[in-house]
Amino acid sequence: MSDQQQPPVYKIALGIEYDGSRYYGWQRQNEVRSVQEKLEKALSQVANEPITVFCAGRTDAGVHGTGQVVHFETTAQRKDAAWTLGVNANLPGDIAVRWVKAVPDDFHARFSATARRYRYIIYNHRLRPAVLSKGVTHFYEPLDAERMHRAAQCLLGENDFTSFRAVQCQSRTPWRNVMHINVTRHGPYVVVDIKANAFVHHMVRNIVGSLMEVGANNQPESWIAELLAAKDRTLAAATAKAEGLYLVAVDYPDRFDLPKPPMGPLFLAD
């Protein structure tokens, strides 16, 4: 037995951006493409040892990320450029590292997070798009974004989101705290921006699906509040499609001092 000391272990956080349209979600699964699998493979090549990552939020199939955060541990000592440029050179073109930061032992990408923020982008036009067709959700009926915004404000604060929770959701509780929800129009694009401490499964897409019914004047503004109070998923609208959804930011305590690049996607301001 050697008395050599164990090499030091480094804990590293990364900001990750990805186009989820060609993946079966974030989480590694057997025999299907996942973002986690591609990232771990690229990191393992740079570290020259097996790497396992932990993420802030496991996005579903077809959902994108501009502000995903992960952490991993490694004995490999590398310069920041290796974890950014080097890893990116080993990643497919639809996944990229945006930043790197050494973090203390008590940091965890999921459990240290205090809030997550999503943006849902609707291309509101009579005709379907060709460019960015997998990065927006097409809705052909005219939408009243101001009406959608007003209807959504009842979701602020701590509420039971059973009516906007997927049937297969495994969370112990349907209660979540929504910090803001804003609906704005940018030309033909309608953007739903929502931030909460955490989300139940399909929560954003289920909220957006019902807000589109209000925006299209198929339901009154009061309908969202009625759905929230009913605590019945079967009364709400269908789940909005995955392709318009982006995880754009994750909040952490200031002491971790993580970078905060522009959220996007694309030209959308913070």
UniProtKB/Swiss-Prot annotation:
UniProt-listed Gene3D superfamilies: Pseudouridine synthase I, catalytic domain, C-terminal subdomain, Pseudouridine synthase I, catalytic domain, N-terminal subdomain
Keyword hit for tRNA processing: yes
Segments for region (RNA binding): 107-111
Keywords assigned: Isomerase, tRNA processing
Pfam families reported in the protein's UniProt record: PseudoU_synth_1 (PF01416)
Recorded catalytic activity of this chain's protein: uridine(38/39/40) in tRNA = pseudouridine(38/39/40) in tRNA
GO molecular function: RNA binding; tRNA pseudouridine(38-40) synthase activity
Site feature location: Interaction with tRNA: 58, 78, 110, 126, 139
Binding site for substrate: 118
Interaction with tRNA: annotated segments: 168-172
Enzyme Commission number, as recorded: 5.4.99.12
Catalytic site: 60 (nucleophile)
GO biological process, one term: tRNA pseudouridine synthesis
Family: Belongs to the tRNA pseudouridine synthase TruA family.
Function noted in UniProt: Formation of pseudouridine at positions 38, 39 and 40 in the anticodon stem and loop of transfer RNAs.
Quaternary structure (record): Homodimer.
Identification of the protein by name: tRNA pseudouridine synthase A
Gene that this sequence comes from: truA
